[in-house]
Design a protein with these regions (language model features):
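P-loop NTP-binding core
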Residues: 1-197
Length: 197
């Protein structure tokens, strides 16, 4: 059964997509069956993997809008063992289901957890229903952050959401493992030596 890793941060430009794409490619290069789900409507995971956008193809956002099953959006990539569920750049964040467990239920009920070793979910820099769906589906959360004082506020906002989700999951008997990874570290600057608290 697949482990689900969510890569998230409240702040845009924090390296979420680069981290997601590179981890997915590395896991696939090491023989793992990987599925990368792009919840960010910018659609940069597809670009990073060399997958061309195709009109009227199923997307993760079409799943949230109820247009098709999640499994119908799985696409091949040029990387052996690496699949992608692409984003829809025209998705309206106000539309779609408000159910927080929709993604978790679909991953299980559609058999997606059994056909992959690792599922990586790249999230948008927002605190919305898509992020909550990702977090409730997750086994692990990775928070890339730039060690700079402005990035600290986004991490603090996300920590409150992680606490809420973690508390609910603890009541269900499951745990959410969270890790932080500094990115874009400049060791010649003082901020590269200290992490925000």
């Amino acid at each position: 059964m697949a482990q689900v890793l969510v890569v998230t941060n409240r702040k845009g430009g924090s390296g979420k997509t680069s981290t997601s794409v590179n981890l997915a490619a590395e896991f696939a290069a090491n023989g793992r069956r990987v599925l990368l789900i792009d919840l960010d409507t910018q659609g940069h995971c597809a670009i990073g993997l060399g997958v061309k956008a195709q009109k009227d193809t199923p997307t993760v956002h079409g799943f949230f809008d109820g247009r098709h099953p999640l499994s119908s959006a799985i696409r091949e990539t040029p990387w052996e063992g690496l699949h992608l569920i692409p984003a829809d750049p025209l998705f309206d964040h106000g539309s779609g289901s408000k159910e927080e467990l929709l993604l978790r239920q679909a991953l299980a009920s559609e058999g997606i957890l059994g056909t992959h070793d690792i599922i990586i979910i790249d999230t948008p820099p927002s605190l919305d229903i898509l992020l909550l769906n990702a977090l409730y589906a997750a086994d692990r959360v990775l928070v890339p952050f730039i060690p700079h004082f402005l990035a600290g506020e986004g991490v603090r906002q996300l920590a409150r959401v992680l606490f809420r989700v973690g508390s609910r999951r603890a009541n269900e008997g499951t745990r959410l493992l969270v890790g932080y990874v500094p990115v874009k570290v400049n060791l010649s600057m003082a901020s590269g030596h200290k992490f925000p608290s």
